[in-house]
Swiss-Prot record:
The organism of origin for this protein: Bifidobacterium longum (strain NCC 2705)
InterPro entries: Ribosomal_uL22, Ribosomal_uL22_bac/chlpt-type, Ribosomal_uL22_bac/org-type, Ribosomal_uL22_CS, Ribosomal_uL22_sf
Domain of life: Bacteria
Keyword Lyase tagged: no
UniProt-recorded name of the protein: Large ribosomal subunit protein uL22
GO cellular component terms given for this protein: cytosolic large ribosomal subunit
Pfam families: Ribosomal_L22 (PF00237)
Subunit structure: Part of the 50S ribosomal subunit.
Gene of this entry: rplV
Keywords tagged on the record: Ribonucleoprotein, Ribosomal protein, RNA-binding, rRNA-binding
Length: 119
């Protein structure tokens, strides 16, 4: 069984979020939460919250199906970061000019699944 969580329009650049996602890809879900909890990067928080949401979704899915739920059997099957909308802002510069500032957003997707053979 697999469960999915998507966080959309997260105010962190996709490049920085991808660094965090690459750290946890393929790992056990509980191990990945611990890694993200102690990562100093600001992008670790939204990735961790999305992962915890995917774990909670797996718990709900297992309860609905009447299956036993073991968090230790979950691993990160798939995780990726897509680019969201870019907020464009302008900063005043010298001599009446303006410089554009791009505030990028991300869509973070995490899919967790049971290990093959685990029941």
């Amino acid at each position: 069984m697999e469960a999915k969580a998507i966080a959309r329009h997260v105010r962190v650049t996709p490049r920085k979020a991808r660094r965090m996602v690459d750290l946890i890809r393929g790992k056990k879900a509980t191990e990945a939460v611990t890694i993200l909890k102690f990562a100093p990067q600001a992008a670790a928080l939204p990735v961790r919250k999305t992962l915890e949401s995917a774990i909670a979704n797996a718990r709900v899915k297992a309860d609905k199906a009447g299956e036993p739920f073991r968090e230790n059997d979950l691993y990160i099957k798939e995780t990726y970061v897509d680019e969201g909308v870019t907020l464009k802002r302008f900063r005043a510069r010298a001599q009446g000019r303006a410089a554009r500032i791009n505030k990028r957003t991300s869509h973070i997707t995490v899919v967790v699944a049971n290990k093959e053979g685990a029941r």
